[in-house]
Amino acid sequence: DLAMATGLTTLRHLRDNKIADKVAAQGEWLKGKLAELQKRYPVIGHVRGLGLMIGIEIVKPNEAQDHMGCYPADGELSALLQKKCFETGLILERGGRHGCVLRLLPSLLISDAELDVFLDKFEQALLAAGVKPV
């Protein structure tokens, strides 16, 4: 009974506070900010996601694109970025082809200020990994 009451209370809180709408808006904002970073750091390939569940593909932009226009995956750099992110306090998962996709899976209650901190720390990790902005 306690578990059911807790679950119901949680669902009501999510509905009453429009958490899904907030998360959708934050996700779109964050993908836009990552697109800005992508312009400065071409190792950032495709950025995709739903809400705040976002994947950041890490690629080799100096190599030839395949028949679909995609750069080769860079699993090594992705692993290094994951490590550098961890050193700044960010925990990102890896997945995708050759482990080249960094996965952002924050709490649904993350604040806008915390998303700004993420962006700053992610850029710090790029620089620490030796990625040069263009």
Predicted regions mapped to residue ranges:
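Conserved N-terminal phosphate-binding loop of PLP-dependent enzymes in the Aspartate aminotransferase
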Residues: D1-V134
